[in-house]
Amino acid sequence: MIYEGRILNKSCIEKRFIAFKFVNILRELGYIKYIVLKKETTDLIYIKKGNDKLLFDKNDTSSLLNVYAYKECKEIPTEKAESAGLETFFRFTDIIGRELVILEILHKYMEKYSDAIFYVDNGLYFTKQDIDRIYNLKEPDAEWIYKNPDTYKK
């Protein structure tokens, strides 16, 4: 099964500006832009610095990260998100094997946009407080995306 994750924000926030900030976060983490495609959604593919070849190690899933930035269109993944006035700003596809990379990205993103929510297709929602708790664990938990965030409350 392939899971996807979405960063949700209030729909009144300027999407183009946030997309620019998101790219800066990825660059800070060592990703470089490789391809930008499509009109309504921007398909951003990033390759980890140091991976200067176009060939990928199929065992290193974190070396390629595929993120759709919704700058022109509106996607609301659930009724719960709609009732909270949230819509998709960024969608991570095929998140399996990239859980810790996504956690690091979310931690940096939510430092700037603390009202953002991370939604996973398995029905789980993560707030900034949830992400902070998981990010600050003594031992990284690569399975965090598949666990209820309440698991990490003390």
Label every PLM stretch briefly.
Residues M1-L44:
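Short, extreme N-terminal segment that most often corresponds to the first beta-strand
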Residues M1-E4, L8, L100-K154:
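Acidic, proline/glycine-rich low-complexity IDRs
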